């Protein structure tokens, strides 16, 4: 029996332990399916965009031009994007063009701000399919699959409909599971949860600080700093301190400064 696109994606996705690596897999899959770019937002009401552990926008790592990503945040384009607003009202995939006169927008009275957003998008792509994903707690996220040639949009959307729909849902669900694991890792009721002090010490270790330097920073003894670092390594089931830092970064517990 032939393995489908979404099955291959799910198999690879299950091995991803961070939002960053999962997002890169999404971008790779988009290209293999024939889309030029992919984008996602975990909560359509959020105006910020997710970042990598090094502070870079994940969208940039996925292949989006830096100026486009920064403009989306700085100009709060998500506040006025008509596609983002539609995601809260439907579970169906939305096929749309960046041209305000496109088929999706006929019969809709777009506000000037919405028209401006669509025209801004045209500097980077011509059309897209956006798959809304309704999440626990009433939030709605989405994955958008973009193409640079509007003439190919409808056929591309039709040919990849099942794959984009299933992959979009699998991606957001996986991020929800990673999020739950991260929350569990800092839950005081969890015996393996890192304490605030252990996270602090591990954060300084990620910045290259020695045990002696960490002890001075937290105003505790050298032995206390070592104790917290060893506890962190044990709780994260890491082989050493460097491994613990990598695990903590992948789970979003710490950020490399």
Task: Describe the residue ranges of each PLM region.
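Short hydrophobic/glycine-rich mini-motifs in sensory/regulatory modules
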Residues: 133-143
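Alpha-helical protein-protein interaction scaffolds
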Residues: 218, 254-256
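Juxtadomain coupling helices with adjacent low-complexity linkers
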Residues: 1-12, 19-20, 141, 147-187, ...
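Short, basic, alpha-helical segments at the C-terminal edge of helix-turn-helix-like DNA-binding modules
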Residues: 241-252
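Regulatory input/activation interfaces that engage signals or partners
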Residues: 12, 27-129, 134
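Recognition helix of helix-turn-helix DNA-binding domains
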Residues: 210-243
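The N-cap/first-turn positions of alpha helices
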Residues: 197-201
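Short helix-to-turn junction characteristic of helix-turn-helix DNA-binding domains
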Residues: 205-209, 248
């Amino acid at each position: 029996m032939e393995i489908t696109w979404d099955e291959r994606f799910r198999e690879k996705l299950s091995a991803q332990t961070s939002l960053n690596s999962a997002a890169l897999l999404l971008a790779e899959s988009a290209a293999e399916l024939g889309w030029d770019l992919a984008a996602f937002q975990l909560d359509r009401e959020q105006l910020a965009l997710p970042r990598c552990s090094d502070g870079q926008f994940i969208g940039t790592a996925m292949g989006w031009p830096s100026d486009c990503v920064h403009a989306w945040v700085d100009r709060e384009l998500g506040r006025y994007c008509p596609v983002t607003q539609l995601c809260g009202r439907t579970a169906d995939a939305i096929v749309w063009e960046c041209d305000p006169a496109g088929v999706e927008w006929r019969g809709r009275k777009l506000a000037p701000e919405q028209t401006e957003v669509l025209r801004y998008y045209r500097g980077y792509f011509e059309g897209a399919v956006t798959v809304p994903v309704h999440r626990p707690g009433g939030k709605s996220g989405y994955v958008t699959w973009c193409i640079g040639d509007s003439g190919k949009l409808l056929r591309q959307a039709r040919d990849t409909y099942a794959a984009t729909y299933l992959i979009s849902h699998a991606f957001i669900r996986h991020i929800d599971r990673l999020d739950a694991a991260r929350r569990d890792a800092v839950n005081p009721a969890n015996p393996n949860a890192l304490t605030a002090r252990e996270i602090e010490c591990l954060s300084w270790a990620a910045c290259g600080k020695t045990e002696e330097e960490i002890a001075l920073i937290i105003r505790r003894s050298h032995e206390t700093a070592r104790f917290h670092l060893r506890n962190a390594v044990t709780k994260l089931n890491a082989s050493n301190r460097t491994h613990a830092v990598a695990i903590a970064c992948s789970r979003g517990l710490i950020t490399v400064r």
